[in-house]
């Protein structure tokens, strides 16, 4: 089994794919997460030992948190891969394959957790931490309006399974690179306000990414 992640991968697609891969391996399956050229170093601990660079012969391809073919990773597109089944939480999912879509879930990680339990997988500390990354990042650390009581119950179950949430929360929500700090300062300085100060607009030209030695990862985490 090879699991696909989406373009510009976030915590939900990576955490969900990692947890599903680990769960399938526990069941005796040969499973991998397909490489994605846009993976960033923050996610390395959660993908360690799980990634393959090419499609093994006869592999079944599954997607995690991918809502359309246009979101397939560049690596998957280059290899001509499309999933034969998909797991997702976006109601707009348009993939032309059998799929499990639960739009009432805040994150794909919630669905993967339920699937693994249904399959009889023992949720290990590592699986729990992958799923916690998935759920916490897609809910803004449980601040977004998509957060439900089931989201909290799932997170509680992951903590009970051994997930060490403090370093995860610190990594994804409390840690800023120097490049990101510089960009936030620049954007705050150049922000323009409209509608009696209720709307703020700022522009981030691509040249500033190079000027600040920043990555797309830094840009996606900016909060002003």
Regions found by a protein language model. Name each.
Residues 1-8, 15-44, 53-59, 139-222:
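Hydrophobic helix-and-loop "lid/oligomerization" segment in the mid-to-C-terminal part
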Residues 6-7, 36-37, 64-67, 87-90, ...:
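Fold-independent oxyanion-binding glycine-rich loops
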Residues 10, 20, 62, 88, ...:
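Divalent metal-coordination and catalytic microenvironments
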Residues 12, 71-73, 212:
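Short helix/loop capping segments that flank catalytic or ligand/cofactor-binding pockets
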Residues 23, 77-85, 118, 149-150:
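A glycine- and small-aliphatic-rich helix-loop capping segment at beta-alpha/alpha-beta transitions
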Residues 29, 82, 121:
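Short glycine/serine/threonine/alanine-rich loop segments
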Residues 47-98:
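Active-site cofactor/cluster-binding pocket
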Residues 90-154:
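Short alpha-helices
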């Amino acid at each position: 089994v090879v699991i696909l992640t989406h373009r510009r991968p976030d915590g939900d697609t990576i955490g969900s794919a990692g947890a599903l891969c680990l769960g399938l391996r526990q069941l005796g399956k040969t499973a991998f997460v397909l490489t994605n050229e846009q993976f960033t170093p923050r996610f390395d601990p959660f993908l360690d030992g799980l990634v393959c660079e090419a499609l093994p012969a006869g592999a079944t391809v599954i997607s995690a948190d991918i809502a359309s073919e246009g979101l397939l990773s560049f690596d998957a597109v280059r290899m001509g891969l499309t999933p034969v089944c998909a797991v997702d939480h976006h109601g707009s999912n348009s993939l032309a394959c059998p799929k499990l879509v639960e739009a009432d879930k805040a994150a794909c990680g919630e669905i993967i957790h339920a699937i693994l339990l249904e399959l009889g997988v023992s949720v290990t500390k590592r699986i729990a931490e992958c799923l916690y990354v998935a759920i916490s990042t897609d809910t803004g650390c449980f601040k977004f309006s998509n957060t439900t009581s089931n989201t909290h119950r799932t997170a509680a179950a992951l903590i009970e399974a051994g997930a060490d949430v403090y370093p995860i929360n610190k990594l994804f929500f409390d840690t800023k690179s120097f490049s990101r700090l510089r960009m936030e300062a620049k954007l705050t300085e150049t922000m323009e306000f409209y509608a009696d100060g209720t709307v703020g607009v700022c522009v981030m030209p691509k040249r500033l990414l190079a000027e600040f030695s920043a990555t797309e990862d830094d840009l996606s985490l900016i909060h002003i």
